[in-house]
Swiss-Prot record:
Protein name: UDP-N-acetylmuramoylalanine--D-glutamate ligase
Intrachain disulfide bonds: none
Any one GO CC term of the record: cytoplasm
Family according to the record: Belongs to the MurCDEF family.
Reactions it catalyzes: UDP-N-acetyl-alpha-D-muramoyl-L-alanine + D-glutamate + ATP = UDP-N-acetyl-alpha-D-muramoyl-L-alanyl-D-glutamate + ADP + phosphate + H(+)
UniProt xrefs under Gene3D superfamilies: Mur ligase, C-terminal domain (3.90.190.20), Mur-like, catalytic domain (3.40.1190.10), NAD(P)-binding Rossmann-like Domain (3.40.50.720)
GO MF assignments: ATP binding; UDP-N-acetylmuramoylalanine-D-glutamate ligase activity
EC number(s) from the headed UniProt entry: 6.3.2.9
Positions bound to ATP: G119, T120, N121, G122, K123, T124, T125
A Pfam family recorded for this sequence: Mur_ligase_M
InterPro entries: Mur-like_cat_sf, Mur_ligase_C, Mur_ligase_C_dom_sf, Mur_ligase_cen, MurD
UniProt xrefs under NCBIfam families: murD (TIGR01087)
Amino acid sequence: MKNISDYRNKKVLVLGLAKSGVNAARLLHKLGALVTVNDKQQFDDNKDAQELLADGMRVITGRHPVELLDEHFELMVKNPGIPYSNPMVKRAEALHMPIITEPELAYQVSEAQWIGITGTNGKTTTTTLIGLMLNQQRPHHAFDAGNIGIPVSQVAQKVGKDDTIVAELSSFQLCGIKTLHPHIAVLTNIYEAHLDWHGNRANYVAAKMRITMNQTPDDYFIMNWDLPEMHELAKQSKAQIVPFSRKNAEGARAQLIDGWLTFDGDRIMKASEMQIPGLHNIENALAAIAAVKLEGVGDDAIREVLRTFSGVKHRIQYLETIDGRRVYNDSKATNVEAATVALNAFDQPIVWLAGGLDRGLPMDALTPLVKKHVKSMVVFGQTAPLMAKIAKDAGVPVQTTENVMTAVPLAYEVSRPGDVILLSPAAASWDQYPNFEVRGDDFIKAVNQLKATVESGDK
């Protein structure tokens, strides 16, 4: 880790905890900063706050008191989920206080080279593939971190200058970067998402494009050339554009050609040899291939990873086969586009579990997909009425239930051997769960309970 003296005795406010806030606070404390942590959750129920207090940091919980900013903090490290419309954040902006997110802090103290990955869908899988491929061959280590679940500030404290940080970066995180400069940036795709947080699509796209704002002509920006919008967005970057395409777009360096994954025209392997299903995963693989080829990784390492990698938890993750039904957990599908990808990934009849936070977005584009792929639906959460209407319009039976735990046995009852039982909510989890991981873990728990019941002969 760099020897950073800029933070010594600096008054820093960490706004919001969770994993990123906790690790940012610990890193700042280690660097000698005077850290105050403010989290909305009450202290008695806030294990993170209790541990930080025990470590010697000042902790204020239960609310976000705007008057706290009268103490003249020199920096705010904001939890990425807290919007800029929050009164504390707006007051900090009015005071011209620098506001950053945790990845920016990590970048400032890290000696490693960075590869940054963003996009509406496919970020985690692409990040994971890049890390696995780099570690398959190189003598130095690649560390996956960021929105993938491991805070970058945690990794930044142990990487060396010859290592690589492979960082999944959300639009929320990118809004708070200042100097973060990935040598290779990847933009997997852009669809409608998080418009409630960003206000409009233009702001969302601008947030995604911040991943390339500090790049130079010596850097690389990998983009999905199958999306016409990318061709215009590419003009905003100073980096060398490296396009990838599943549909033979002109100028793409990583392409699917006649069923083969290729780079600069050279065949690497047949896409059919990949362990993970779906056309979307071919796109993720092409993006990863482009990134690691720029780093000199050979075809053998790429083939080994793509032939063995079975998927990321909560992303069309295969769980079990129960009495002939294959069960998949796609809790990460927090929007219509991600659920569309999941529904298109299977040829078998699907019993679809869906529902979650209602962001007020149109969902009727799902109707023809339901008609084509789905035999029955089980819906829950705020969007349950919307999803039930989609089922009705598609002529598909539907049941409404409380949550994913109660949905699983209902899905089993209406399924038959040879079917797929798929959780792919098409909505965020925040109406019932703190995040999609907890929702997915509940689904896994319910599936395990169902399996035990079926195998005991009680079903």
